[in-house]
């Protein structure tokens, strides 16, 4: 089977409606997948039912059968029965903590490797990488490990922007990612701007969307990746 995974930087771009910009990206993954399971564990500041309702509404035009994993008595069985997997944004630490809590890490990894389509945005994209060490989120809870789903073998940083607010003296995002590359100089980080996504199809990886991404790896810092770039070499 072929890995088919879409890793979105965000659920919105600019002032567009929730998930509206992502519909054209998600649609090709739904041609043979009707029954989807949504994992809302990153949504700490809202109820899981509220989160699910927003996703169902946002993706309504795709006519998918979407249920929340929290609605199922057996989360593992829900993953096994699903045609596709959706993981939303929020707090990456809480998301990963719950994936470990319910023993879903290896199961999701295996399902995706067997061809089950995967769509993740923001935190849902973060956990698709090798680890969550390059998330933007506050560590509000400690997962058993930072190791993540490893759908792609590198690091991700969604919502990327290196804007510095005038008068603000904190580190920029690029400076934070430089810190990671000093500790792990051989591990690439792909920083994805809002409105863009990575699409992995088996051994191919391409950048989709309207904004470029950036590569951080060792001495390479904030190297521009144009839209449409073939990044398949990063899968090796």
Curated annotation (Swiss-Prot):
It is found in: Cytoplasm. The keyword Acyltransferase does not apply. Gene3D superfamilies: 3.40.50.880. One of its GO terms (cellular component) is cytoplasm. The keyword Chaperone does not apply. InterPro entries: Class_I_gatase-like (IPR029062), Peptidase_S51 (IPR005320), Peptidase_S51_dipeptidase-E (IPR023172). Pfam families: Peptidase_S51 (PF03575). Its EC number is 3.4.13.21. GO terms for molecular function: dipeptidase activity; serine-type peptidase activity. Its main location: cytoplasm. Hydrolyzes dipeptides containing N-terminal aspartate residues. May play a role in allowing the cell to use peptide aspartate to spare carbon otherwise required for the synthesis of the aspartate family of amino acids. Belongs to the peptidase S51 family. NCBIfam families: PRK05282.1. This is Peptidase E.
